[in-house]
């Protein structure tokens, strides 16, 4: 692993200053074989003078979750299904390191859940009723959650409170599902090979437990189908001739060879992960232990002890035998982000009633950023008779994360955030189309979206300022990572100065979302009580287009980076708030890139760039339903809707631009631009990618890890 792991280990070692003395990681084990390996690991770590590891004996992974939560243990490696359970109340554990699979040249932090059958048996995935099945274990990803989620339409099951196990026991003629209560569901333990109390045990004491065990159940002829992962058959059968006796069952009810798992699988599943407490979890110490252990006992090391290996006759003790190593997981990633919405939806679908599943599919969960948006969203929800319901987060990135986890479905984003959301796998659904003199309300939904102009605004009286003399001036921004307020002007400035030190180029700023201690937040004011200073939501009075212009209008900043209509919307009586009611359009001018200045009304010939309109984003599986719901809502509450202004208006706000821009005429179709790259355009995407060298986004970094 010369190419891969030295770089991997050096990343993890940075910034780790914890003294190993008097500190120990208590690793949780679930069988005598794991306890034996853990004890050997403990002795080996002492020899190399690494961080101390001690071993805590439990009888199941679930007992380990409880022990870690109550601070009686510190770490254990879990399958994705148990990562989900561990992340719930009251445990609140989070994944801190992911197992890496694949090859040195193509390392992966995921695997594929597959269904395998012997060649010549001729049944398909939709013909499993009455057959015999082999599973890795109850509640595990590849062996239970994914296949049962896929088979739910075929099960005679209305959902809780009736146990899923009861429906599965009726569906298959016999099974081996380790970890099931064999007394209550004898049919689900009928095929298991353990003896006495070990029959159907939730550990390697049951010979058919885990991936290799479930495949052995198929090999031995006990079962007709095995639910395992893509690498299981390769690990169990090194010879291709032997593997050729088996086939994959595909979701489209065909079969493929076992090496075609990328085209024929039940789901893409995140790899097993080490979990720890989310508070006081010894995360740095655990990672320091794992770094040293990989360095000394990892894949390809000459030591007699192998961290990712098990003695003859044993499999997957403490870690998967197939793991190449471990990658540290960003602190931004909780269990929901790690697992992703598809996997979580599968799990929830197996725990909810049919009515609950249908309600969740029918509703749209809108994500509101901050308390002001939450209030507007709640009113929308009431007026829509719960067709739309609300989730809330304090920042736009946190809302994007909720959509990724399936805890929300959509929100409307500025182009800069569309870039981040797109990099995380979300897609645009509908675009905000603004009013213009040539607009026609009748064709707004189908009219191509024009985009808007990003501009730099100054007070007319401050006549010495030009685009070329901004160094040392005070600036007002909509928010970090937003298009007109940050990405476009900062991209141009970094290109001109070849520097990313914006806090040195500008004397002071209000750029919501920056470090509150930095000069980039020095001009921010927070709310009327002085709280929430520099937060990237409407609790910061200088946030957004209107807020950035207010920062300029109140003589706090010298220049405001906004869009072309911002000044028009807030002067000459258009905005009746106290701070804006006396502002005159003629008191402001635009800075042109050639060093001249022009009236605000001449933005067409004096702007920084053309920016893509805001757009609604969601997960790809929600696009069709979301578009249908939003167009229906728009017919009621849009600018010309039959219930606006009588009941509620989507495109009006008590404070400016909540949920959508107030000057939105309609939500328009995308004209075939269905990916973030197509919607934003190649020039904008390239510009953002270059600007990314100047700043980091925790969510972007998290998504880069998750999408690897």
Curated annotation (Swiss-Prot):
Primary residence: secreted
Q: What is its EC number?
A: 3.4.21.-
Which amino acid positions bind hydrogencarbonate 1, per UniProt? 136, 140, 142-143
Which Pfam family would be a valid example here? Transferrin
On whether Secreted is a keyword of this UniProt record, the answer is: yes
The main enzyme category here is hydrolase
| Active site: residue positions | 92, 278 (nucleophile)
Instruction: Respond yes or no to whether keyword Flavoprotein is given for this record.
Output: no
- SUPFAM superfamilies (UniProt xref): Periplasmic binding protein-like II
Q: Which UniProt keywords apply?
A: Disulfide bond, Glycoprotein, Hydrolase, Immunity, Ion transport, Iron, Iron transport, Metal-binding, Osteogenesis, Protease, Repeat, Secreted, Serine protease, Signal, Transport
Task: Output the InterPro entries linked to this UniProt entry.
Answer: Lactotransferrin (IPR030684), Transferrin (IPR016357), Transferrin-like_dom (IPR001156), Transferrin_Fe_BS (IPR018195)
MF annotations from Gene Ontology = iron ion binding; serine-type endopeptidase activity
State the family it belongs to.
Belongs to the transferrin family.
Protein name listed in UniProt: Lactotransferrin
- Give the originating organism: Camelus dromedarius (Dromedary)
Q: Which gene encodes it?
A: LTF
């Amino acid at each position: 692993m010369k190419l891969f792991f030295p770089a991997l280990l050096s990343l993890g070692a940075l910034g780790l200053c914890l003294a190993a003395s008097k500190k120990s990681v208590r690793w949780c084990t679930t069988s005598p074989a794991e306890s034996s390996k853990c004890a050997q690991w403990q002795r080996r770590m002492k020899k190399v003078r690494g961080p101390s590891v001690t071993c805590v004996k439990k009888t199941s992974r679930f007992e380990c979750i409880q022990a870690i939560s109550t601070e009686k243990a510190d770490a254990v490696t879990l399958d994705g299904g148990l990562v989900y359970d561990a992340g719930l109340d009251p445990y609140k554990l989070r994944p801190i390191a992911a197992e890496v699979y694949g090859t040195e040249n193509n390392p992966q932090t995921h695997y594929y859940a597959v269904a395998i059958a012997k060649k010549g048996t001729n049944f398909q995935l939709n013909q499993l009723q009455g057959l015999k099945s082999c599973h890795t274990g109850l509640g595990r990803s590849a062996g239970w959650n994914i296949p049962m989620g896929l088979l739910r339409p075929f099960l005679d099951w209305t959902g809780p409170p009736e146990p899923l196990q009861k429906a599965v026991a009726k569906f298959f003629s016999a099974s081996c599902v380790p970890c099931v209560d064999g007394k209550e569901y004898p049919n689900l333990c009928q095929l298991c090979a353990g003896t006495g109390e070990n029959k159907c045990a939730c550990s390697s004491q049951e010979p058919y437990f885990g991936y290799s065990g479930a495949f052995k159940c198929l090999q031995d002829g006990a079962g007709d189908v095995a639910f395992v992962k893509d690498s299981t058959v390769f690990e169990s059968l090194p010879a291709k001739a032997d593997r050729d006796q088996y086939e994959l069952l595909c979701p489209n009810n065909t079969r493929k060879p076992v090496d075609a798992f990328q085209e024929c699988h039940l789901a893409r599943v995140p790899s097993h992960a080490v979990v720890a407490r989310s508070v006081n979890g010894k995360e740095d110490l655990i990672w320091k232990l794992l770094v040293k252990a990989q360095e000394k006992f990892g894949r390809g090391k000459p030591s007699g002890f192998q961290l990712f290996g098990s003695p003859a006759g044993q499999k997957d003790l403490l870690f998967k035998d197939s793991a190449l190593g471990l990658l540290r997981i960003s602190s931004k990633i909780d269990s929901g982000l790690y697992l992703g919405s598809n996997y979580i939806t599968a799990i929830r679908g197996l725990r909810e009633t049919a009515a609950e599943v249908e309600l969740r599919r029918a509703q749209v969960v809108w994500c509101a950023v901050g308390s002001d948006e939450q209030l507007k969203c709640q009113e929308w929800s009431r007026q829509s008779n719960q067709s739309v319901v609300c989730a809330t987060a304090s920042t736009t990135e946190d809302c994007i994360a909720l959509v990724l986890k399936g805890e929300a479905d959509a929100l409307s984003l500025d182009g800069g955030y569309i870039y981040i959301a797109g990099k995380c796998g979300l897609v645009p659904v509908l675009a905000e189309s603004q009013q213009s003199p040539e607009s026609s309300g009748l064709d707004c939904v189908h009219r191509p979206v024009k985009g808007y102009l990003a501009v730099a605004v100054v007070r007319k009286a401050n006549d010495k300022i030009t685009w070329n003399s901004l160094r040392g001036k005070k600036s007002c921004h909509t928010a970090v990572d937003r298009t007109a307020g940050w990405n476009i002007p900062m991209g141009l400035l970094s290109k001109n100065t070849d520097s990313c030190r914006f806090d040195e180029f500008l004397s002071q700023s209000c750029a919501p979302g920056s470090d509150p201690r930095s000069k980039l937040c020095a001009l921010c004011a927070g709310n009327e009580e002085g709280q929430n200073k520099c937060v990237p939501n409407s609790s910061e009075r200088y946030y957004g287009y209107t807020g950035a212009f207010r920062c300029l209008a109140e003589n706090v900043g010298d220049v405001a980076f906004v869009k072309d209509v911002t000044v028009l919307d807030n002067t000459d009586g258009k905005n009746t708030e106290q701070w804006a009611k006396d502002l005159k359009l003629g008191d402001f001018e635009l800075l042109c890139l050639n060093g001249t200045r022009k009236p605000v009304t001449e933005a067409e010939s004096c702007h920084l760039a053309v920016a893509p309109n805001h757009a609604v984003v969601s997960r790809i599986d929600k696009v069709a339903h979301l578009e249908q719901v939003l167009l229906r809502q728009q017919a009621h509450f849009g600018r010309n809707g039959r219930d606006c202004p009588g009941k509620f208006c989507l495109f009006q706000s008590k404070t400016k631009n909540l949920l959508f821009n107030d000057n939105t005429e309609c939500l328009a179709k995308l004209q075939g631009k269905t990916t973030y790259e197509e919607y934003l355009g190649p020039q904008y995407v390239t510009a953002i990618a270059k600007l990314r060298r100047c700043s980091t986004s925790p969510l972007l970094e998290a998504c880069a890890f998750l999408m690897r």
